[in-house]
Design a protein with these regions (language model features):
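A basic, amphipathic helix-loop patch mediating RNA/tRNA/ribosome contacts
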Residues: 1-45, 80
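Conserved SAM-binding loop of SAM-dependent methyltransferases across substrates and taxa
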Residues: 87-98
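A short glycine-rich, Lys/Arg-flanked "PGG" loop and its adjoining helix->strand segment in the class I
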Residues: 155-172
Length: 280
């Protein structure tokens, strides 16, 4: 359905908002105006929202924009890879931040917004599974990577994605606990409603990153929730100190510890669920 596809691709924050956009005549499928929210979103046809007054092609752009600001990531002049590009919210942010080129990688087809698809700085890599990424697919190789993926764990995406980077390597990942937690830890509607699960998931991902020869040096809360109201997190990943990683002042980055994770999770719950008691 068109309304569900709008939410899934980050073009609307809820099904109600998606239906309203269709009724207002702002939704286009393959160049033609969508008539009903219940119509099928046919594969291969680009779904777009016009005049929606968003600064990016999808609301997901707000998430990466927050990460670039919070972690002090400079995309100017860099070659980047967006793993799980979908409509292109992250790709759009990178371009607006001055990226020289963005490889937009997605396993799907026809999802990327037409404006980005026709931008000379964007290399569209559709029908490309993140698990199969290798350095040989990129010329030139990217130094900055970002990812926003669904229905797959970062543990499957990060190993190949990190390996394609070269130069001043850095990676920003959106962590979606609903796709990382055990099935029994995810509540009705696919929503994680336990802060302890958030801490557990983030701790596991941070430790996993360490096994890859990288380290998570920054963690922040996504400024907006996922489509079903899930709290999401942003992770700043750099090569380990042994690889010579340094911040702007020449200092080696510090690893995140359990206390850091607990503080960020508590801040997230205070923002999105102020009446809830965070477990300790």
């Amino acid at each position: 359905r068109i309304d569900a596809a709008l939410v899934e691709r980050g073009l609307a924050g809820s099904l109600d908002e998606a239906r309203l956009l269709v009724m207002e005549g702002k939704v286009y499928l393959g160049g033609g105006k969508a008539e009903k929210a219940s119509d099928k979103a046919k594969p291969g046809l680009v779904l777009t929202v016009r005049d929606n007054k968003l600064p990016y092609v999808s609301r997901g752009g707000y998430k990466l924009a927050r990460a670039l600001e919070a972690f002090g990531v400079d995309a100017r002049g860099r070659v980047c890879v967006d793993v799980g590009a979908s409509t292109g919210g992250f790709t759009d942010v990178l371009l607006q931040a001055g990226a020289a080129r963005v490889y937009a990688v997605d396993v799907g087809f026809g999802l990327l917004d037409w404006r980005l698809r026709s931008d000379a700085r964007v290399t569209v890599m559709e029908k490309t599974n993140a698990r199969g990424l290798t350095g040989e697919l990129f010329d030139p190789r990217p130094s900055l990577g970002v990812t926003d993926v669904s229905f797959i764990s970062l543990e499957a995406v990060l190993p190949p994605a990190l390996c394609v980077l070269e130069g001043a390597r850095r990676f920003v990942a959106l962590v979606k606990p609903q796709f990382e937690a055990r099935r029994e830890d995810v509540g009705q509607g696919g929503v994680v409603r336990d802060s302890a699960v958030h801490e557990k998931v983030l701790g596991r991902i941070v430790r996993f990153v360490d096994t890859l020869g990288w380290q998570a040096q920054g963690l922040d809360v996504s400024p907006i929730t996922g489509a079903e109201g899930n709290i999401e997190f942003l992770l700043d990943i750099v090569p380990r100190e042994a690889d010579g990683a340094r911040d702007g002042l020449g200092r080696a980055p510090e690893r995140l510890c359990e206390a850091d994770i607990a503080r960020v999770v508590a801040r997230a719950w205070a923002r999105f669920h102020p009446d809830a008691e965070v477990e300790r």
